[in-house]
Curated annotation (Swiss-Prot):
One GO MF term attached to the UniProt entry: tRNA binding
Membership in a protein family: Belongs to the class-I aminoacyl-tRNA synthetase family. Glutamate--tRNA ligase type 1 subfamily.
Record GO cellular component, one term: cytosol
Binding-site residues, ATP: 253
Localisation: Cytoplasm
Described function: Catalyzes the attachment of glutamate to tRNA(Glu) in a two-step reaction: glutamate is first activated by ATP to form Glu-AMP and then transferred to the acceptor end of tRNA(Glu).
Organism for this UniProt entry: Microcystis aeruginosa (strain NIES-843 / IAM M-2473)
Motif interval(s): 'KMSKS' region: 250-254
InterPro entries noted in UniProt: aa-tRNA-synth_I_cd-bd, aa-tRNA-synth_I_codon-bd_sub2, aa-tRNA-synth_I_CS, aa_tRNA-synth_I_cd-bd_sf, Glu-tRNA-ligase_bac/mito, Glu-tRNA-synth_I_codon-bd_sub1, Glu/Gln-tRNA-synth, Glu/Gln-tRNA-synth_Ib_cat-dom
Keywords: Aminoacyl-tRNA synthetase, ATP-binding, Cytoplasm, Ligase, Nucleotide-binding, Protein biosynthesis
Domain of life according to the entry: Bacteria
Subunit structure: Monomer.
Motif 'HIGH' region, residue numbers: 9-19
Name of this chain's protein: Glutamate--tRNA ligase
Amino acid sequence: MTVRVRIAPSPTGNLHIGTARTAVFNWLFARHHRGKFILRVEDTDLERSRPEYTENIQAGLQWLGLNWDEGPFFQTQRLNYYRQAIQTLLDRGLAYRCYCTPEELEKMREEQKARNLAPRYDNRHRYLTPEQQAQFEQAGRKAVIRFIIDDDQEIIWQDLIREKVIWKGSDLGGDMVIARTSENGEENFGQPLYNLAVVVDDIDMEITHVIRGEDHIANTAKQILLYEALGAKVPEFAHSPLILNQEGRKLSKRDGVTSIDDFRKLGFLPQALVNYMTLLGWTPPDSTEEIFTLEAAAEVFSLERVNKAGAKFDWTKLDWINSQYLHRLTGEELVPLLLPYWQEAGYNFAAETDRAWLIGLATLIGPSLTRLSDAVAESRLLLTPLANYNQEALSQLQLEGVKDIIKDILAAITPDLTGEVAKGIVETTTKAHRVKKGLVMKSLRAALMGELHGPDLMQSWLLLNQKGWDISRLQQAVNS
């Protein structure tokens, strides 16, 4: 048997971290079993679905490295398949037309609430006669198609994560709406609803394993009944834990950063984000190993090691993982990743003309980066011809003899300064002024950087020298 799994997002918003984590688990499972990973776009919600969201979802999956083998398939292009399935269920007496109005359904819910009962449809139109149906249609009522769910049946499956799961038919809310008739009343059933469309797609696409969030468990019970009613083999199911916020509630848009776009803009690398998402609910065989590629994770991935409990989102852990990936990159590799952040902040560096200097800058700040978006903050002392002196630096420059030290250093500077020459200037100045080297270095840092703390001073000096900014800054210090 070839393993076939799918990720089936709805294009009603940008790619969400929860959907992306589900995609990661499906991708890993497919690759581990040398199977197929299928992309299906569930776009039957015509009011909320947008083509730009479809593009965002596909771009997000590609950015994360989650390449799919088949698709994308769109549900709006498969309506005839759903209508055929609905007709089959009607012909078999497993579904029926329900003509209840919204007002009648609301009154039903209110009465149930008053009696402290869970809201459910009471199946009142399950056994309408043809004459009764005709009367409703003559009155202009629009029908929905309901699938019959017997209250006294049990739905049982062996979940690959949660083990044995049992649902009672009586807990599923009564006979389930699977489609609405069209506005003009034609017998084309209008728009099929989620549970019916999903089952038909999974049957046609020969999906062997459905891996999704635990919030779909009730849907799974309903869908198993539909598989059986359509005479199809029921796939294996695995329900992964939800991603939780710091308060232990399901992560939602109210928590702020939830879309993959958000994480990308914040400066997270796709490899790091995928690495972290893999650990959100899954424990690798070697629990001490936390940094790995998708391909390495696929070799050892199994659903048995997915946790049942919710996975709390940990920003500190994500930042640490991201920093590990960043610290492995060379300056040359960092430049194209950091350049957009410098440019967005108003620094007009060019990838070609400033390339060598930017590589040196990226090499200098690379070990300090946690996110790509840290680029400006970590390099801010080196980005302009003049320094912005804080009070601590100004106080250092006002000490007796310091400006004379700066003048001597300024006089000794040459273009294309090397590390050895720079060290020699410091040594010569220290001896000439008969002071401790620490005073010279501290004063030089104050003059060049505008602050007494920051990146490596000698490397910073060489970078500033390449643009002639060491001279302009030392002159600024002398005149301060």
